[in-house]
Amino acid sequence: KSIYDNLMGYLNYIEDYYFQILKESEYVEYPSPHESLFQNNYTKLREDIIFCKKECDNWYKMVQDKTKERVCLNHGNVSLKHIIRNSKSYLISWDKNHFDTPIADLIDFYHNEWNNLEFSGILETYFSKCSLSDEEKKLFFINISIPLKVEFGENEYINTIRVTDLFDYIHKTELLIGPYYSIKNKEQ
């Protein structure tokens, strides 16, 4: 219940946050490039938030009667910088390790490296080697689908890059999880 409440609370917060940005930019007579880009793509952001809320409700229906939750030791800050490759690969820098759901590190890794790696093969390999329940997969997909929070500053160039990254993140995540929601995949 607390995971559901936290997710829904954050989704409501991020929805209000971006709605306020949209409202403020609508009053500008000549919108800047980042404001114009944001206005033109706001419906995509809104659709993503609606999808996340719907999936949160579906996930909660799946787990509301469960009394046990699976936990494991998580690294806490997985990124490419913390992987040493040799004949075997090693994960270093365990300073932030903690016990959490098995998907916590996968979520962090996606948030840290979404723009640097093609994750479809990584997920396929991960799901084949590590057994995740349907509930855990759904929770993972919800968490990575939540839009990133963009902070704006004084530099228009950087603001435009941040808005572009926001919508690139949404698009790339949509392409990544889409096959797992296809009719063919649901039948298997």
Language model feature labels by segment:
Residues 1-26:
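Conserved ATP-binding subdomain of kinase catalytic cores across diverse folds
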Residues 7-10, 41, 45, 143:
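Amphipathic alpha-helix face/heptad-repeat signature
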